[in-house]
Amino acid sequence: MRVSLFLQKQIIECSKAFQPHSTRLQWPKSQDKVFVAMSGGVDSSFSAYLLKSQGYNVEGVFMRNWLDEDSAPSGCPAERDWATVQKVCKKLNISCRRFNFEKEYWNLVFEPSLDLYENGLTPNPDVSCNRQVKFGALFDALKKHCENNVKGDWWLASGHYAKSVVNIETNESHMCIPTDKRKDQTLFLCTIRKEALEKTIFPLHNWTKENVKKQASSAGFKEIAEKQESQGLCFVSPNVGRKFRKFLQRYLNFSDRPIKVIAGKNVVGEFSGNHGIWSLTVGERCGLSLPQAQSEYFGRWYVWKKDIKNNALYICRGTNNELLMSKCIYLKDWKWCGTKLQNLEKSALSCFVRVRHQQPLQPAKVTWRNPESVKIHFQDKQRAVTPGQVIAVYVNDVCLGGGMVDTVEPEKDFD
């Protein structure tokens, strides 16, 4: 598709703006107030330590997002984490405060995720939690607090592995990939509001996870550095095991009808209705036992499509079956992160795309069909792109934003 001269110029200018020499690190001045979002983990604790050691006026903030501890999956016991945060803040000689966002988390993250599960999709609760709660409700609460209680500028610091920079000419904020590419968490942050990004810093932007743990131990936080990383509800997917699936069963509706399992045009088996079609994800192995002695059923079978209306699950043989592959997908609910490019409708932009966490960036052509709908055509085939997941788009190492996978065009369809 032909690109207008105006857009060509804009892309060139945009690309120039994202060059390292055109940006500076977004960072507070010595007199600024810095609130550190703390979870009790090593990343946020070490972030607070770094800022305190650099002489900043630091205050820890802790969020409780889940009300009923007994009903939560084994992930992040809030009271124990709050006690750890208080202990760290006392050691650093900084104050800390606690915010309760159970209502916001339930209404803005958990219930929408349940709706997606019930419609056969696989959501990213961690992405919506960052946008709606950490860089939404928490940011708004801090902003309101600072209007009357803080003189001068203030910042929100997060222990995420990401980097916030400012364009020297336009003074606009951008989010970039950090030094530790393996721990890069920009995918989880790709939809946060521009207003929040402009006030956010990431102290670990030039640190590796290995060095964070090493230095945290040396700084007196050995117990925190050595404990197993916990994952709260935001960061859990159905793939992690039966415990989370059992937890979701308390909230999701089930069909009385059995789930039909279809290979090609043939029904090859059934799951009981209480299994929950929502618990099966595109790309994972099908748990149905097929007669391996018969050649037509021999091998490993994987989910490639879910049909909620007809309560059917489609499977294919082989982990790299063409039915699992796609080069063209469509996103909805697109959100910009920082710079918003103008007049992009129906014009293809060469970008990089991240489909899932820790995956290398994938070259692709990205077309904005309208302000909220995006078409992505990958250079290489992608396996098991899953409706409901969030995908992030990049120019150079700058994250432009992200959107939810709406539809996927497989490379091959059954005759």
From Swiss-Prot:
Disulfide bonds join 129-234. Keywords: ATP-binding, Disulfide bond, Mitochondrion, Nucleotide-binding, RNA-binding, Transferase, tRNA processing, tRNA-binding. GO terms for cellular component: mitochondrion. Its EC number is 2.8.1.14. One of its GO terms (molecular function) is tRNA-5-taurinomethyluridine 2-sulfurtransferase. Its main location: mitochondrion. Residues 124-126 are annotated as: Interaction with target base in tRNA. During the reaction, ATP is used to activate the C2 atom of U34 by adenylation. After this, the persulfide sulfur on the catalytic cysteine is transferred to the C2 atom of the wobble base (U34) of mitochondrial tRNA(Lys), tRNA(Glu) and tRNA(Gln). The reaction probably involves hydrogen sulfide that is generated from the persulfide intermediate and that acts as a nucleophile towards the activated C2 atom on U34. Subsequently, a transient disulfide bond is formed between the two active site cysteine residues. Belongs to the MnmA/TRMU family. Catalyzes the 2-thiolation of uridine at the wobble position (U34) of mitochondrial tRNA(Lys), tRNA(Glu) and tRNA(Gln). Required for the formation of 5-taurinomethyl-2-thiouridine (tm5s2U) of mitochondrial tRNA(Lys), tRNA(Glu), and tRNA(Gln) at the wobble position. ATP is required to activate the C2 atom of the wobble base. This is Mitochondrial tRNA-specific 2-thiouridylase 1. It comes from Schizosaccharomyces pombe (strain 972 / ATCC 24843) (Fission yeast).
